[in-house]
Amino acid sequence: MNAATEFDLGPLTWVKGEIDLALQRAEQALEAYVDSADRTQLKFCRTHVHQVHGALAMVGLEGVTLLTEATEALLAGMEEDRLPSGDAAVTVLHQTLGALRQYLDDLMAGEPNRPLLLLPVYQSLETAR
């Protein structure tokens, strides 16, 4: 491991359960939006993603926070009806939330911190925006 990929898991260990819960709630809010087309659910989803963003920033995963920022921006645009909120956007959001969860699980399992692995997901978000 080199200095660029070395990451102290200690702080992440403390907040990982809360991050997982926030990601789960974000998924639930997104599903509720799909079922009801109630834009309030997009706000709930964005709120949970914002919680994840804050936790990631606190533990020093700045590269990953770029993904949560882009996710929040897409959700805000959908909520305010500035961006399309159809199936394609919802699919990208589902993929993003899943990729975040998997990336963090991989970190906890000992994988190095390589946020560039999330670049394809980030690009999908940017395309949706």
Task: List where the protein language model places each region.
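Short, well-ordered alpha-helical segments
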Residues: 41-45, 58-74, 88-96
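Extended amphipathic alpha-helical scaffold segments
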Residues: 22-30, 63-76, 101
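Generic structural signal for well-ordered, non-transmembrane alpha-helical segments
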Residues: 17-20, 24, 43, 50, ...
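Long, amphipathic alpha-helical coiled-coil segments characteristic
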Residues: 3-48
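Secondary-structure edge/capping motif, primarily at the C-terminal ends of alpha-helices
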Residues: 26-37, 56-59, 75-85, 107, ...
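Structural secondary-structure packing elements that flank or coincide with functional cores
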Residues: 1-9, 82-129
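Beta-strand-dominated lipid-handling architectures at cellular/organellar boundaries
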Residues: 53
